[in-house]
From Swiss-Prot:
UniProt xrefs under Gene3D superfamilies: 5' to 3' exonuclease, C-terminal subdomain (1.10.150.20), 6.20.10.30, BRCT domain (3.40.50.10190), DNA ligase/mRNA capping enzyme (3.30.470.30), Helix hairpin bin (1.10.287.610), Nucleic acid-binding proteins (2.40.50.140)
Top EC group: ligase
Binding site for NAD(+): 35-39, 84-85, 124, 147, 184, 300, 324
Cofactor(s) recorded in Swiss-Prot or TrEMBL: Mg(2+); Mn(2+)
Name listed for the protein in its UniProt record: DNA ligase
A Pfam family of this chain: BRCT
Domain BRCT intervals: 707-788
Binding residue positions for Zn(2+): 418, 421, 448, 454
GO molecular function: DNA binding; DNA ligase (NAD+) activity; metal ion binding
Reported function: DNA ligase that catalyzes the formation of phosphodiester linkages between 5'-phosphoryl and 3'-hydroxyl groups in double-stranded DNA using NAD as a coenzyme and as the energy source for the reaction. It is essential for DNA replication and repair of damaged DNA.
Length: 788
């Protein structure tokens, strides 16, 4: 046991450090250490104060909950303090809690399996968000507040009123005249990912995790910002109540649910500590599948009378405990950074860490993604870093604890030569191509230029090529691929089809039967579907679904290989980024050679032939003009130009006077169009696109000819609202394939309107005009009747 003087010094250090962390966490919304590190510091302080009670002061962090409220908000005094819960980190902590509950209720002690007098506990996940108090008077929401320091919080009434699942007026009847609801406001995982995507798109700083995002959103002085954030409430209890409530915790939560307040769908009653342990294991197993982040489960004595009997201690109720999951964030030392080479040659930094337990697993490596991420984190070799591991996700470094940086820390540098093959490493600037705006820098990537001469790239390329979703060559596992490459038997995917019996049987682990089986599997893969073959090629950004789309839409490898980016983007879900990746892949001489060798050696993907009718009907002259991104020519202007001139050549040839005759085309737009096509490269680009559309059977003139005699020829349809079984683009394509014209507005000439959920003014106008309206199920039935 340390002396009183030594203990006093350590206690002072701990209080200072904890107070600094509290300030960053509660006031600045910028946590500086993981929860697990904070808990260790707090528990050390708590233990020292227990050994030296004479050193306890009212200002100690152990004597209060959290930190002070932000000065920018009004202050709210909690009539019933919002206390935090004690924590259980190990199974024994939970058993000790149950023992203390039994002793407090004067019940017989149970054994390790909970035998003895049974205590009933409510069980629910511990959501990772911000605790709030919602005050209802006569059923109306009158105030919302944060927990703050447990006694005083922040008045965030305007902000909580923007959270969509918080009722502004209680439902039903029987609620107390005054009811204070306690709950957690959190951000679902999907909403968090979408918010961060928007932050990055707008140049903003992404949030570290959903908890920070929820807390930051609720502490906005402008409630309009809060309203734009995907926040939700989960009620978990009641503070003040002027009226009768059920006599169990679960009963109270069910009452809240009846009054319109959301509660956990995972709420459960456990009879005894053994069932609590089973609940903890069950929630832990489904943790990653839940739509929100949790960091443990909460157990509460279910009977309210027993809660009163057990009472409180200084910081927490005696009748509740939070059983935490193993920490998903920890701190450790960055020992080194090594570089790996991926299938496309990308050089990726990998952190080598001092081994640390994270979420129950020893972690010694973590991804750093790329050098832009290294720069963003400001990480150096020797730093103390925060590491996170969640589910099957590769551990990653979240941040650096800068104040712990050693004096001999070293910067991270990309090697000039590939660490595997020694080829040069080149830096490539990534470009984001977006319709209607200039290309902008999206960071950079370092690549080994060795291609398949680099064994790391070759091995990964072969592993991908033979995988189950690609060529599906059974028996060619990673270790066998490594042998084939290391022995020089395979230098490209095409070499697989030249392997002999003599070569294979010499491989480690092979005998006569396994050799015959592997050669048979290779031979059986010579006629893959076109989609499988395209996926197997390993085109950057082309996954299994995109490969299926390319095969279905374009029908042949030759067509896919020759398609211009401006034509590829007519396919649903293929944007400019992916279109350029596909085009660049097939333009590459080396890739063309590998494909030619595969075909020479008997690999023939099974092609479907023509362009699929749904996609053949996608292109229109207005759409082509719109996709050229001519300044000041919007979609409506493109439509009027097409109606006035009828062909691309006529538009290219139109002079100033001709253009000024186009209805409602401004002088600025006419001048911009003329300036655009006066540049030969622009006119050539437009002609090349049109020529390929015509060659592929996707030209609008082909569509008009094909439409003659189709069942919906001459009809005009409108799609409005959300379609749940298909995208709007797919619905449009299927209608156009049947000869219909799909318009963007409803008029007296409209034949039919398809209205999904969320249909608005178009549906109203259709009803006013007496236009036929179909819901989605009727629409699908009509398509089926017409053979689509």
């Amino acid at each position: 046991m340390p002396s009183a003087q030594t203990a006093a010094e350590r206690i002072a250090e701990l209080r200072s450090e904890i107070d600094a962390h509290n300030y960053r966490y509660y006031v600045l919304d910028e946590p500086s250490v993981p929860d697990a590190e904070y808990d260790r510091l707090f528990n050390e302080l708590k233990a020292l104060e227990a050994e030296h009670p004479e050193l306890v002061t009212p200002e100690s962090p152990t004597q209060r909950v959290g930190g002070a409220a932000l000065a920018a908000f009004g202050q709210v005094r909690h009539e019933v303090p919002m206390l935090s819960l004690g924590n259980a980190f190990e199974e024994q902590d939970l058993l000790d809690f149950d023992r203390r509950v039994r002793e407090g209720l004067d019940l017989p002690a149970g054994d390790l399996f909970g035998d003895g007098a049974v205590v009933e506990y409510s069980c629910e996940p511990k959501l990772d968000g911000l605790a709030v108090s919602l005050l209802y008077e006569n059923g109306h929401l009158v105030r919302g507040a944060t927990r703050g320091d447990g006694s005083t919080g922040e008045d965030i009434s305007a902000n909580v009123r923007t959270v969509r699942n918080i009722p502004l007026k209680l439902h039903g009847s029987g609620w107390p005249a005054v009811l204070e609801v306690r709950g957690e406001i959190y951000m679902p995982k999907a909403g968090f990912e979408a918010l961060n995507a928007r932050q990055l798109e707008s140049g903003g700083k992404p949030f570290a995790n959903p908890r920070n995002a929820a807390a930051g959103s609720l502490r906005q002085l402008d409630s309009k910002i809060t309203a734009s954030r995907p926040l939700e409430l989960c009620a978990y209890g009641v503070g003040r109540s002027d009226g009768e409530l059920p006599d169990t915790h679960i009963g109270i939560l069910q009452a809240l649910k009846g009054w319109g307040l959301p509660i956990s769908r995972e709420l459960k009653l456990a009879k005894g500590v053994a069932e609590c342990r089973a609940y903890y294991d069950a929630i832990g197993a489904k943790r990653d599948a839940l739509p929100y982040e949790i960091d443990g489960v909460v157990f509460k004595v279910n009977a309210v009378e027993q809660q009163r009997e057990l009472g409180f201690r200084a910081r927490e109720p005696r009748w509740a405990i939070a059983h935490k999951f193993p920490a998903r964030e920890e701190i450790t030392e960055l020992l080194d950074v090594e570089f790996q080479v991926g299938r496309t040659g990308a050089i990726t930094p990998v952190a080598r860490l001092k081994p640390v337990q994270v979420a129950g697993v020893t972690v010694s490596n973590a991804t750093l993604h790329n050098m832009d991420e290294v720069a963003r984190l400001g990480v150096m070799i020797g730093d103390t870093v925060i590491v996170r591991r969640a589910g099957d996700v590769i551990p990653q470094i979240l941040g650096v604890i800068a104040e712990r940086r050693p004096t001999d820390a070293r910067a991270v540098h990309v090697p000039e030569q590939c660490p595997v093959c020694g080829s040069a490493v080149e830096r490539t600037q990534l470009i984001k191509r977006s319709k209607g705006r200039e290309s902008v820098s999206e960071g950079s990537i370092y690549r080994c230029v060795g291609r398949l001469a680099c064994q790391a790239q070759l091995k990964q390329a072969i592993i991908h090529f033979v995988s189950r979703r690609a060529m599906d060559i059974d028996g060619l596992g990673d270790k066998i691929v490594e042998q084939l490459v290391d022995k020089g038997l395979v230098r490209s995917p095409a070499d697989l089809y030249c392997l002999t019996h003599e070569q294979v049987i010499e491989l480690e682990g092979f005998a006569e039967i396994s050799t015959r089986n592997l050669l048979h599997a290779i031979d059986a893969s010579r006629k893959p579907s076109l989609a499988r073959f395209v996926y197997a090629l390993g085109i950057p950004d082309v996954g299994e679904e995109t490969a299926k789309l390319l095969a279905r839409a374009l029908g042949s490898l030759d067509r896919i290989g020759r398609a211009l980016p401006d034509v590829l983007v007519y396919l649903p879900d293929v944007g400019l980024e992916v279109a350029h990746e596909i085009h660049s892949f097939f333009e590459d001489e080396h890739n063309r050679t590998v494909i030619a060798l595969l075909r020479e050696r008997g690999v023939e993907p099974q092609e479907q032939g023509d362009v699929h009718p749904e996609f053949a009907a996608c292109a229109t002259l207005p759409d082509l003009l719109d996709r050229l991104n001519i300044p000041h020519i919007a979609r409506t202007g493109a439509q009027r130009l097409a109606e006035r001139f009828g062909s691309l050549e006529a538009i290219i040839a139109a002079d100033w006077l001709d253009l000024r005759q186009v209805e409602r085309l401004t002088e600025k737009a006419a001048r911009s169009l003329r300036d655009y096509f006066d540049k030969p490269e622009n006119a050539e680009r437009a002609r090349l696109i049109e020529a390929q559309l015509r060659e592929f059977g996707m030209h609008w003139e082909s569509e008009r000819k094909a439409a003659e005699g189709l069942p919906l020829a001459g009809q005009t349809w409108v799609l409005t609202g959300t379609l749940e079984t298909m995208s709007r683009d797919e619905g449009k394509a299927r209608l156009e394939a049947l000869g219909a014209k799909v318009a963007g507005s409803v008029s007296a000439k409209t034949t039919c309107v398809v209205a999904g959920p969320g249909a608005g003014s178009k549906l109203t106008k259709a009803n006013e005009l007496g236009v036929t309206v179909l819901d989605e199920s009727q629409f699908i039935e009509r398509l089926a009747q017409l053979g689509s």
